[in-house]
Amino acid sequence: MERPRAPPSPLNDAESLSERRSLEIFNPSSGKETHGSTSSSSKPPLDGNNKGSSSKWMEFQDSAKITERTAEWGLSAVKPDSGDDGISFKLSSEVERSKNMSRRSSEESTSSESGAFPRVSQELKTALSTLQQTFVVSDATQPHCPIVYASSGFFTMTGYSSKEIVGRNCRFLQGPDTDKNEVAKIRDCVKNGKSYCGRLLNYKKDGTPFWNLLTVTPIKDDQGNTIKFIGMQVEVSKYTEGVNDKALRPNGLSKSLIRYDARQKEKALDSITEVVQTIRHRKSQVQESVSNDTMVKPDSSTTPTPGRQTRQSDEASKSFRTPGRVSTPTGSKLKSSNNRHEDLLRMEPEELMLSTEVIGQRDSWDLSDRERDIRQGIDLATTLERIEKNFVISDPRLPDNPIIFASDSFLELTEYSREEILGRNCRFLQGPETDQATVQKIRDAIRDQREITVQLINYTKSGKKFWNLFHLQPMRDQKGELQYFIGVQLDGSDHVEPLQNRLSERTEMQSSKLVKATATNVDEAVRELPDANTRPEDLWAAHSKPVYPLPHNKESTSWKAIKKIQASGETVGLHHFKPIKPLGSGDTGSVHLVELKGTGELYAMKAMEKTMMLNRNKAHRACIEREIISLLDHPFLPTLYASFQTSTHVCLITDFCPGGELFALLDRQPMKILTEDSARFYAAEVVIGLEYLHCLGIVYRDLKPENILLKKDGHIVLADFDLSFMTTCTPQLIIPAAPSKRRRSKSQPLPTFVAEPSTQSNSFVGTEEYIAPEIITGAGHTSAIDWWALGILLYEMLYGRTPFRGKNRQKTFANILHKDLTFPSSIPVSLVGRQLINTLLNRDPSSRLGSKGGANEIKQHAFFRGINWPLIRGMSPPPLDAPLSIIEKDPNAKDIKWEDDGVLVNSTDLDIDLF
């Protein structure tokens, strides 16, 4: 018997309307359907014609650019009602629900045969209807895993109706050119209850093929049995390289400068996490959707976080500190989980930081489930990919000078997909009215390897013509040989002089400066990447270079053991080391505890799989890390003892830190926090480590407890430099002004040494909770992002959590940009401690503590009073509630070899581990 539909609540007609319009496919035998209205929004094409002054990457010239960039991370701009000139932001999902609830197209199917397929509860239906993702839910307990729920986006994307898909397996999307190997992978994952993420060619109802980035993940019950599968689809036809991902150069590397599948997979994995958590915590999601109507306004003094506020009792505040982290004995972050975030406490803003109030926060229902996922470093875009201008890069060393990179803005301007552009020559933009004499000038410039700026008529894919101010610029390598051509386009259609039928001289002059500046920025950005024409053996050549000791550590027992091998004429390699145990894994590889055979000396070995590094655009990251570590000679930074490569991996041999990670140390504390004395000690050593890095021109970019290792004596070592940025640094000695004669004292103020990296970067890298605002907005960042991360680190050490964490990446980024900084009143922290955090977490990087005077500004803060900076190496770490746990070699452990299964893990793809 069919369960009657609950009547709409008189208290919330909007919620009732949302429930009726949400897509429901639970009674598949119905012959009656109700089709709701559908609408879709598309991003307006970028013409690249920005006005006004231009920043280095020419992003955010006006509010439209801000809106466009923030929209990529789930935020929508809202014009204020009053005369305020600012822009308010709220999550896109909230804007969509409040502006037009019919956007969630409705299709219902009812039937008297209620037992045909398992029902999904009304509560779950309501929760799922709040999501913006395109996905289906299948019943894993039934043969062929029939679909029992689909989001409205699935119908919009595929063109099918509920009657046509309910009860069916998703294979109806397959067609003649669907890769059978990918289909076999999906079947194997479904059969074994595993996850899958991959791109395959699917077909819409009308036969139109499209590239579908499919992510499948299981939902399991308490006994570990798979009961549902979520299949999330993302149409990536516009931006994927498509079949070009298999196009190779003569050197065996991809013709495309960037491998886009890896980018899209990382975003998809974060997106499906929200779907999974919605199913697992549907009650909280429904409650949040009802109360989530408060807008977030930048720099607002009012409550910034969406959600209903309810005061909590003291007992509730105590539950915040309930132990919940679980770590492996080695301190590895592989399988750690954290329940201490389940009841995050939200405080009202407090400008003077003298008192706080504890207020409940609704968006924290799934934070513990995301703990292990979001602590990994992310690498979402290089500086090159974030230049929002119309440009392409071609390689004249290949036949016909094909395009190997096309910006997203270029795709919008020309209406072509990336798959249609890569591998082609730019002449596809020509048409009937294209002046061939101008085209010949471009050909002559290519032949002569010189730059040229011209204007000509080009055509979009749909046949629309536009006036293109085109700038061609050659790019040469360090030897002066031609490497690439950079082609920048600017749509000048709105500035054509009718009588002359061309751009005016003034417009051409101004626009020429703009396209030339863009080409210069592209030239700088592309140099961060390895030369696409490099032979694979040359790409990893740096890892085969010998390593020699630097002055301060050359007499250590670790170096003496390595030097014995070098003295014998041998090259240090994998065969010299015996695997002991795995220590953990990061974004680019796995870390092993190893022993140098015959010496008893222990080291840490980081192994990175070559194919995975290439597929995920991380080859240059591995090379940068090797270069950086080879320069380090400091007690709070790792020492490189050797680097080498095998046929499949590149390896780095560095210090083994038996104290494990600071993350694990925090985890073991009864309250999951450190005392101020301990936090001060560790923060001080981090400051000194960062000061040394900045002096070398290195921006760390991934400071977090997982990357702070502890030596046996309790002192720190900063680890993992694969996300770091290396540039130049010009040290300065600032002489203080001499005091007046009247006030002259015996002690003269000492000069201040300041050394901060001088160049900006615009890569989108870091760890979600620690990323600085300027990285999210794409405004370009300097070493000031490390001081922001120091503020987050201090907050986590003192309060047991980070201040801006949200239930998903979009919400975390929204919080980082707009949420007021508050402090839990249930945990006493001194005023100077809160003041230091507040000045470090200044959203304006130019006003952030440390941005002008570097580490010296931070050292002088009152929080660090009592720290003897020159002698901090000799200090004993303050006592801890739970002492340091030392990782030791187990004498009874079974001997293992590198050839054994699972010892040197070959991770060739992105992993999904949501459960």
UniProtKB/Swiss-Prot annotation:
Q: Which residues bind FMN 1?
A: 169, 171, 174, 187, 202, 212, 233, 238
Binding sites annotated in the UniProt record for FMN 2:
425, 427, 430, 443, 458, 468, 470, 489
Q: Which residues form the Protein kinase domain?
A: 577-864
Q: Cite the effect that the entry attributes to residue 727 to I.
A: In cav1-2; loss of chloroplast avoidance response in response to high fluence blue light
Q: Which cofactor does it need?
A: FMN
Q: Where is this region: Disordered?
A: 1-62, 84-118, 281-344
Ligand binding (ATP):
583-591, 606
Effect the entry attributes to changing residue 217 to Q: Loss of dimerization
Q: Name one GO molecular function term.
A: identical protein binding
Tell me the InterPro entries matching this sequence.
Kinase-like_dom_sf, PAC, PAS, PAS-assoc_C, PAS-like_dom_sf, Prot_kinase_dom, Protein_kinase_ATP_BS, Ser/Thr_kinase_AS
Family of the protein in this entry: Belongs to the protein kinase superfamily. AGC Ser/Thr protein kinase family.
Q: Any idea what this protein is called?
A: Phototropin-2
Species for this entry: Arabidopsis thaliana
State the gene name recorded for this protein: PHOT2
